[in-house]
Amino acid sequence: MLALKISVYTVVFFFVGVFLFGFLASDPSRTPARKDLEGPQD
């Protein structure tokens, strides 16, 4: 049961990390107009 939990958490964290990394890496370059969604500093 512990091995199943570890493998599930590993897969979940892997996909979440890849998704967040890809989103943060590609979003500002593809949609520069959406930079205000990250946090308006102006």
UniProtKB/Swiss-Prot annotation:
InterPro entries, per the entry? PSII_PsbI, PSII_PsbI_sf
Q: What is this protein called?
A: Photosystem II reaction center protein I
Superkingdom field: Bacteria
- Keywords, in A-Z order: Membrane, Photosynthesis, Photosystem II, Reaction center, Thylakoid, Transmembrane, Transmembrane helix
Location comes to:
Cellular thylakoid membrane
Query: Where, if anywhere, are coiled coils annotated?
Result: none
Similarity section = Belongs to the PsbI family.
| Gene expressing this chain | psbI
Membrane-spanning parts: 6-26
Disulfide partners: none
Q: Which organism is it from?
A: Prochlorococcus marinus (strain MIT 9211)
What is its quaternary makeup? PSII is composed of 1 copy each of membrane proteins PsbA, PsbB, PsbC, PsbD, PsbE, PsbF, PsbH, PsbI, PsbJ, PsbK, PsbL, PsbM, PsbT, PsbX, PsbY, Psb30/Ycf12, peripheral proteins PsbO, CyanoQ (PsbQ), PsbU, PsbV and a large number of cofactors. It forms dimeric complexes.
Q: Which residues form the signal peptide?
A: none
- Membrane topology, as annotated: Single-pass membrane protein
Instruction: Name the GO terms of the biological process aspect.
Output: photosynthesis
Q: How is this protein annotated for GO cellular component?
A: photosystem II reaction center; plasma membrane-derived thylakoid membrane
User: Which function does this protein serve?
Assistant: One of the components of the core complex of photosystem II (PSII), required for its stability and/or assembly. PSII is a light-driven water:plastoquinone oxidoreductase that uses light energy to abstract electrons from H(2)O, generating O(2) and a proton gradient subsequently used for ATP formation. It consists of a core antenna complex that captures photons, and an electron transfer chain that converts photonic excitation into a charge separation.
